[in-house]
């Protein structure tokens, strides 16, 4: 796929994306777009971004050959891009550093964020502390219950965590509340969106901050094995870790790209979070147009995933576009497959992955045995699993 260019000047990736917000937010988004376009062309902005990624986040994150897991499965060699080793334990901080630098550049003193698994909330609270800003994090009440360690981490970092009791009490509702708050306090507040979704320019901006993942991986794989992987795979909720890995590979036609949605209890049940794989129609949510789980009246459907971070009814607009143009394959891993992959990575490699990332590992577990021993799968290990210990223990019937 040569000459890939997206989004267009209106923020559309094909027919997805755009700017579907109340009139009160248009000036704020235009201000943000202008500030980002200026920052994008300022070498000093990127120099500071790279400095913080190196000295504060600890980048580059390594690539690691999961040799024992590969041997156990028999087939393709599995390599992991270790985003779990970043400061705060996931890929989220790549984006929050970038957006916090932009907020400071715009003179904003307060940041707000939404969070599902709590990783983006922790990463936002972290950069707010780092740059001396106040921080409010909106989190669904159900997610607060399943992610208590991260809630406490956010509070330790000085953030105010606001529980959201409306709707499904998960990520979608947290995002609704954060957008409402942004409308009310747009003058002094910067909204750090945590995924490659939302109204333009967020999907492009988040991608640009996250593609450090794929850029590093390309150089590292070349050094490690003398070529690029046959397949690059990542889990997809809103899709920021996936677009960060995929974007630098889009024009590399010999690298197959696979996005793994949350299959929950199966896409033939209502209990999943897989808009593309389940064939969901296009809809509008949180200011952008994309494939969206909805009923015949356009009402957003409930979702289910064992991982809070994938529990979202929509998907970032660039992913919908990459599906439409057939550059990326989207598929699912079910809850039980993700849990099996979680166990395998713990036992064979001594790495406890996030349940989100376990969905990508599950694809490798399922497909590596069907591939040749000389083939290579690169899995984006987007986060570590400390936050999921309680969830996994509960599912195994273990009292902690």
Swiss-Prot record:
Pathway(s) the chain acts in: Amino-acid biosynthesis; L-tryptophan biosynthesis; L-tryptophan from chorismate: step 5/5
Describe the reaction catalysed, as an equation.
(1S,2R)-1-C-(indol-3-yl)glycerol 3-phosphate + L-serine = D-glyceraldehyde 3-phosphate + L-tryptophan + H2O
- The answer on whether this UniProt entry bears the keyword Cell inner membrane reads no
Top-level class of the enzyme under EC nomenclature: lyase
Instruction: Please list the cofactors this protein needs.
Output: pyridoxal 5'-phosphate
> EC number(s) in its UniProt entry?
4.2.1.20
What keywords are annotated for this sequence in UniProt? Amino-acid biosynthesis, Aromatic amino acid biosynthesis, Lyase, Pyridoxal phosphate, Tryptophan biosynthesis
What Gene Ontology terms describe what this protein does at the molecular function level? tryptophan synthase activity
Gene3D superfamilies with a match to the protein in the record: 3.40.50.1100
Q: Which PROSITE patterns match?
A: TRP_SYNTHASE_BETA
Q: Which residues does the record list as N6-(pyridoxal phosphate)lysine (modified residue)?
A: 92
Q: Which domain of life is it from?
A: Bacteria
For this record, the Gene Ontology CC terms, alphabetical, are: cytoplasm
- Subunit record text: Tetramer of two alpha and two beta chains.
What HAMAP family does the entry give? Trp_synth_beta (MF_00133)
Reported function: The beta subunit is responsible for the synthesis of L-tryptophan from indole and L-serine.
Q: Which family does it belong to?
A: Belongs to the TrpB family.
Instruction: State what protein this is by name.
Output: Tryptophan synthase beta chain
């Amino acid at each position: 796929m040569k000459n890939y260019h997206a989004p267009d000047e209106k923020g559309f990736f094909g027919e997805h994306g755009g700017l579907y917000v109340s009139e009160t937010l248009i000036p704020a988004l235009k201000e943000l777009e202008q500030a980002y376009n200026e920052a994008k062309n300022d070498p000093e902005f990127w120099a500071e971004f790279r400095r913080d990624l190196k000295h504060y986040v600890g980048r580059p994150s390594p690539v690691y050959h999961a040799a024992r897991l590969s041997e156990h499965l028999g087939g393709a060699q599995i390599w992991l891009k270790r985003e779990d080793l970043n400061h705060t334990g996931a890929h989220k901080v790549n984006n929050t550093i970038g957006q916090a630098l932009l907020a400071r550049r715009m003179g904003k003193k307060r940041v707000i964020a939404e969070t599902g698994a709590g990783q983006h909330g922790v990463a936002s609270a972290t950069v707010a502390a780092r740059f001396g800003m106040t921080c409010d994090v909106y989190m669904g009440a159900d997610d607060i219950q399943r992610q208590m360690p991260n809630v406490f981490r956010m509070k330790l970092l000085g953030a105010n965590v606001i529980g959201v009791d409306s709707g499904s009490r998960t990520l979608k509702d947290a995002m609704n509340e954060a957008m409402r708050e942004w409308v009310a306090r747009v003058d002094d507040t910067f909204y750090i969106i945590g995924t490659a979704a939302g109204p333009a320019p967020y999907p492009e901006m988040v991608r640009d901050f996250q593609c450090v993942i794929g850029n590093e991986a390309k150089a590292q794989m070349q050094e490690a094995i003398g070529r690029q992987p046959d397949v690059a795979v990542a889990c997809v909720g809103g899709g920021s870790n996936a677009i960060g890995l995929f974007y630098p590979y889009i024009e590399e036609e010999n690298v197959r790209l696979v996005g793994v949605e949350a299959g929950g209890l199966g896409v033939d049940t209502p209990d999943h979070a897989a808009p593309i794989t389940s064939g969901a129609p296009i809809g509008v949510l949180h200011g952008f147009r994309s494939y969206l789980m909805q009923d015949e009246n356009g009402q957003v459907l409930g979702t289910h995933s064992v991982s809070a971070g994938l529990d979202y009814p929509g998907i970032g607009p660039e992913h919908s576009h990459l599906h439409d143009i057939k550059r990326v394959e989207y598929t699912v891993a079910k809850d039980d497959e993700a849990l099996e992959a979680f166990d395998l990575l713990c036992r064979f490699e001594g790495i406890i992955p996030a349940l989100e990332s376990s969905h990508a590992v599950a694809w490798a577990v399922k497909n590596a045995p069907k591939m040749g021993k000389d083939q290579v799968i690169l899995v984006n290990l987007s986060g570590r699993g400390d936050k999921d210990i309680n969830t996994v223990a509960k599912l195994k019937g273990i009292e902690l």
